[in-house]
Curated annotation (Swiss-Prot):
A GO MF label: ADP binding
Pathway assigned to this chain's UniProt record: Carbohydrate degradation; glycolysis; pyruvate from D-glyceraldehyde 3-phosphate: step 2/5
Similarity annotation: Belongs to the phosphoglycerate kinase family.
PROSITE patterns (UniProt xref): PGLYCERATE_KINASE
Protein name, per record: Phosphoglycerate kinase
Catalytically driven reaction(s): (2R)-3-phosphoglycerate + ATP = (2R)-3-phospho-glyceroyl phosphate + ADP
Cellular location(s): Cytoplasm
UniProt keyword list: ATP-binding, Cytoplasm, Glycolysis, Kinase, Nucleotide-binding, Transferase
Quaternary state and interactors: Monomer.
EC number in record: 2.7.2.3
Length: 400
């Protein structure tokens, strides 16, 4: 069934509650990367251009104490949003009460208002009560009472059941997806349920345990699953290969064995690695094929692996990439990740979808973002979606 989209709603004269994902990096009141704010603009603009009142909810960071609140106000985000929209944005420094209600009642059609960080509700009078992240039913009901319709455009939190997404939605007659949410559901959904073949998944990162559900779910769907990053060496161990001092999840070796058996020749592991004696960008490194020698740890895929992976990707029609090929934050071990990102940018006939912090950062660093079909805004959410799980935030959106 298709989901209701914001453009299906009549928003004129309506108070439209929009859950956005403004969880951006902020240091000393300065925003490091405003991509998530930019990504929400189409939905916000649609509402205000159609004479609705846009009331925005978002979390920012994690709030475990009153102290945490000091550096995690959404005020700088509201200011940046005002610049991007080129119009005034009202910021309300509270999450409930008369000040918020009055500000909403004073809105005119086409106005934009940002409510303070929803996770401020997780700590009340110094006590950790988790009203937002624990989906307190009274809070969801209260927030829902502030508007007429609800739009969820925060894919990044769709795998969480919070008061500001599932809580509000369960108290509303009409719940629609924003344009960003619609895009995520479309591209990730098609990749998993209706991919063009050959379909290749590239999964990297440190831990098998983070990606196990995805690998398991994609074995039957993908033509090839390329493995990179630290989790490679748990698979090496499962094959009886030497891993030196490389990262390994000993309690996942049996699981890796069963994946190797189940996947057969669909599973593509690196054939060579860049190794060093210490987890350090400045110590000498070398390329080794196959097993990792004693006293060394693998920190990136090697040149031969890059070539072999590119050969697999060359004819792909659908590619989903999540997770780095090596220790991306160290420049000497970022090459595998960067080369894969660069190569994906050349696949003009394929649907290419990238998710996960390091993969996304690599794509941005290379400037190939516009050559890819879709860059997912949700880390954990996109992984759970690729696992075939139903995400609470999406389940709560009305069907057409």
């Amino acid at each position: 069934m298709a989901k209701l989209i914001v453009s299906d709603l009549d928003v004129k004269d309506k108070k439209v509650l929009i859950r956005v994902d403004f969880n951006v990096p902020i240091k000393d009141g300065k925003i490091g990367d405003d991509n998530r704010i930019v990504a929400a603009l189409p939905t916000i603009k649609y509402v205000i251009e159609h004479d609705g009142k846009a009331i925005l909810f978002s979390h920012l960071g994690r709030i475990k104490s009153e102290d945490d609140k000091k550096g995690l106000s959404l005020r700088p985000v509201a200011e940046r949003l005002s610049n991007l929209l080129n119009k005034p944005v009202t910021f309300v420094p509270v999450t409930e009460g008369e000040q918020l209600e009055t500000a909403i009642n004073n809105m005119n059609d086409g106005d934009v208002l940002v409510v303070e960080n929803t996770r401020f509700e997780d700590v009340v009078n110094g006590e950790q009560v988790k009203r937002e992240s624990g989906n307190d039913p009274e809070l969801g009901k209260y927030w829902a009472s502030l508007g007429d319709v609800y739009v969820n455009d925060a894919f990044g939190t769709a795998h969480r059941s919070h008061a500001s997404n599932v809580g509000i939605a369960s108290n509303m007659d009409q719940v629609a997806a924003g344009f960003l949410m619609e895009k995520e559901i479309k591209f990730l959904g098609d990749a998993v349920d209706n991919p063009k073949h050959p379909f290749v998944a590239i999964l990297g990162g440190a831990k098998v345990s983070d990606k196990i559900g995805v690998i398991d779910h994609l074995i039957s769907k993908a033509d090839k699953i390329i493995i990179g990053g630290g989790m490679t060496y748990t698979f090496y161990a499962a094959k009886g290969m030497g891993i030196g001092n490389s990262l390994v999840e000993k309690d996942k070796i049996e699981l890796a064995k069963s994946i190797i058996e189940k996947a057969g020749d669909k599973l593509v592991l690196p054939s060579d690695s860049i190794v060093a004696e210490k987890f350090d960008n400045d110590v000498p490194s070398k390329v080794v094929e196959g097993s990792i020698p004693d006293g060394y740890m693998a920190l990136d895929i090697g040149p031969k692996s890059i070539e072999e992976f590119e050969d697999v990707l060359r004819d792909a029609k659908t590619v989903v990439w999540n997770g780095p090929m090596g220790v991306f934050e160290m420049s000497n071990y970022a090459k595998g990740t960067l080369e894969i990102g660069k190569f994906l940018g050349t696949l003009s006939d394929a649907t290419t979808i990238v998710g996960g912090g390091d993969s996304t950062a690599a794509v941005k660093q290379l400037g190939v973002g516009d050559k890819l079909t879709h860059i997912s805004t949700g880390g954990g959410a996109s992984l759970e979606y690729l696992e075939g799980k139903e995400l609470p935030g999406i389940a709560a959106i009305s069907e057409k």
